[in-house]
């Protein structure tokens, strides 16, 4: 009974890294090293990474010339690998009729579109990029790696996101900065053993940072803002494995990159529902608590107040699109479903069916349209006043 009891404990790994140097600022291998002597950070501890692998796919697609504003259908593709095994990805939401841009694909973590992006980017080039960015673990040459089917360590994935924050220059982490005595006499200084190397264009890195900020501001990591009140300039990506065994959240600021993993020591132990086991519910709150703590400390102002550089006009233009588009036929279907839902609520106020994902993104579109119409009306009124 005792073994079963402790196997069900959730564990966690947490790592903070300086993206420009690779210096490690914080390392938490688990919840209690005296009892659970297992380090969930180091390179020997590998877990399926889920959707935190998707930014690597998107970056490779950008490098291959795919526009971040290109619309890609969320319909379900079927792929056959070299062994003849078929694979058909699916989404957590019933959104297969929606067309997503790369921005929306990352913000809403759309599996089917990510699977299509790796076909445009190339599976082997994507693996090569992942290796160049810092992943040394095995990655099978199959399309499903786009959704994080590979098992990779937390320190490797944090190194990957450090590459994005470091403008596309890959670094390797190091643990000890210097050795000195109590009087301050320095005996030795250390730095990363491997030289830094550019593996992504600066443009691609800046586009990726902007799109991953969208994940935090209006995507799957949105609760970092509205639930936990963390408003630092943060780009990030949530991740959840298919079996709900692993929850991830990767967060980037200009001067600090943070990787967080949550799960049981035994990957066979998992959450029964995705809403319980997803990275935004398990790993993200730990990152939020960290930021809320360091935000109180004046000595960390260089980290907490740092802002990512603004995009150039050209790069802003390349991202001048919405997250998704809805066809007229789909809009009609959504409007019917909203009418039916509202009618049910009016008929029985004790019954309030939850709003579907499609209804939510449709209403978002309406708000955007209304805001734009107000802006246009104000602009027209000002023109009339100036002309008069």
Predicted regions and their residues:
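C-terminal substrate/ligand-recognition segments
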Residues: 7-20, 24, 59, 63, ...
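Active-site SXXK
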Residues: 21-22, 46-74, 105, 160-164, ...
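Structured segments of extracytoplasmic/periplasmic soluble domains
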Residues: 27, 31, 59, 63-65, ...
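Conserved catalytic neighborhood of penicillin-recognizing serine enzymes
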Residues: 66-126, 170, 182-207, 213
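Low-complexity, Gly/Ser/Thr/Pro-rich intrinsically disordered linker/tail segments
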Residues: 316-388
């Amino acid at each position: 009974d005792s073994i079963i009891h402790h196997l069900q404990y959730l564990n966690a790994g947490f790592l903070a890294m300086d993206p420009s140097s690779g210096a490690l600022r914080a390392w938490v291998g688990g919840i209690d090293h005296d009892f659970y002597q297992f380090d969930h950070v180091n390179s020997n501890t590998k877990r399926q990474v889920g959707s935190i692998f998707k930014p690597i796919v998107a970056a490779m697609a950008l490098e291959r010339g795919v526009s971040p504003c290109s619309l890609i259908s969320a319909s379900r593709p079927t792929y056959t690998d070299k062994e003849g095994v078929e694979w058909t990805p699916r989404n957590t939401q019933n959104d297969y009729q929606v067309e997503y841009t790369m921005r929306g694909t990352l913000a809403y973590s759309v599996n089917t579109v990510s699977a299509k992006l790796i076909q445009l980017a190339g599976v082997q080039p994507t693996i090569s990029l992942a290796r160049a960015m810092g992943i040394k673990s095995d990655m099978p040459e199959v399309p499903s790696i786009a959704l994080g089917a590979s098992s990779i360590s937390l320190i490797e994935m944090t190194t990957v996101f450090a590459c994005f924050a470091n403008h596309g220059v890959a670094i390797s982490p190091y643990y000890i900065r210097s050795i000195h005595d109590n009087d301050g006499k320095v005996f030795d200084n250390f730095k990363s053993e491997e030289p830094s190397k550019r593996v992504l264009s600066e443009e691609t890195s800046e586009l990726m940072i902007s799109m991953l900020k969208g994940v935090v501001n209006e995507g799957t990591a949105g609760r970092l803002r509205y639930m936990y009140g963390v408003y630092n300039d943060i780009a990030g990506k949530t991740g959840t494995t298919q079996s709900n065994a692993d929850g991830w959240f990767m967060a980037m600021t200009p001067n600090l990159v943070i990787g967080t993993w949550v799960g049981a020591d035994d990957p066979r132990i998992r959450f029964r529902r995705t809403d319980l086991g997803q990275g935004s519910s398990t790993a993200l709150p730990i990152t939020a608590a960290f930021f809320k703590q360091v935000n109180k400390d004046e000595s960390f102002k260089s980290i907490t107040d740092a802002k990512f550089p603004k995009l150039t006009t050209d790069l802003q233009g390349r991202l001048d699109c919405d997250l998704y588009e809805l066809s007229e036929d789909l809009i009609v279907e959504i409007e019917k479903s909203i009418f039916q839902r509202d009618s049910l609520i009016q008929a029985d106020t004790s019954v309030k069916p939850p709003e579907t994902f499609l209804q939510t993104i449709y209403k978002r579109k309406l708000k955007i349209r209304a805001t734009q119409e107000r802006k246009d009306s104000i602009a027209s009124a000002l023109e009339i006043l100036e002309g008069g």
